[in-house]
Amino acid sequence: MNILKKLFGGQKTTEEVREMKEKDFDKVKYDGVRALRMHQFDLAAKFLEQALQLNAEDLECRDYLSQAYISMGDLQQAYAQLQKISEAQSDNMAVLLRMADVAYMMEDYIAMTDVCDKALQLDAENVETYFFYARACRGLGDAPRAVSMLTEAIGKRGDFYAARLLRGSILLDQAQLSEAELDATFLYEHIPGNEDVLLLKARVEKAQGKMEEAEQTYGKVMEVNPFSIDAYRERSEVRRSLGDSGGAAEDEAAAKEMGAEIPEPSEGIEQKIKEKMQQMDPYKVFHNE
């Protein structure tokens, strides 16, 4: 039969067409994944888009495509791909958390709250959901609710340091200094060498008017990170309030010099995208390496 088909050009069977389509899909998808891992994001997106035209049901392919879109800065498209995955796997918490993460990068805090609501319906014990919810509330200017969400998360996991750090920062912003001090002190007792913790502690002390303590703590920040522009800039204010004009001038000069030498950090969405590129597939949704 195969000889006759070759001689007379017989049409391929449905099974043969399906097998060829599967082979084409696997090849294009593999090319896309390889390009993604080589950080050739535009090329990866083209291959993966083509692969989905051959098999729109492949959720793993959509996950890789969402990563490519994130790296390209096309967050709307990335979110759309994750949304399709979530529609197919409505009980997939990891995908919902990734959607919340992308919504955070887009600064779409309404979308974040919607996704977090869905996640809490699935698992009210997941502390990361409360953390994302708090970020969304902070973005919406609802500090009390953000603090409430973080308190819930910390109550469920006492060593959730990121949540306590964020809560301390929000409390500081709200001038709730005694409460912020509790978080800063707790964090300092548990992770004393952390730059962000030291910076929070110094800022709380500065806000409380404990200038001598704040000066020392800013010094510890600099020991951990000698290039912390914020630490130099803020310590200059502390030193000036202590009457140390010379020290304040030195800190101001150091901050100015570092600011001129180091490229200005990206802000907002651009910075969030950059951070995301450094942690592709953080939740290991499909566990592919």
In which residue ranges do the predicted regions lie?
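Terminal, low-structured helical/coil segments at or just beyond the last alpha-helical repeat
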Residues: M1-V17, G247-E289
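Alpha-helical segment of the N-proximal tetratricopeptide repeat
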Residues: R18-E60, Y64-D74, A94, R98-E107, ...
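Register position in tetratricopeptide repeats
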Residues: R37-M38, S71-M72, M105-M106, G139-L140, ...
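Canonical positions in the second alpha-helix
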Residues: Q50-A51, K84-I85, K118-A119, E152-A153, ...
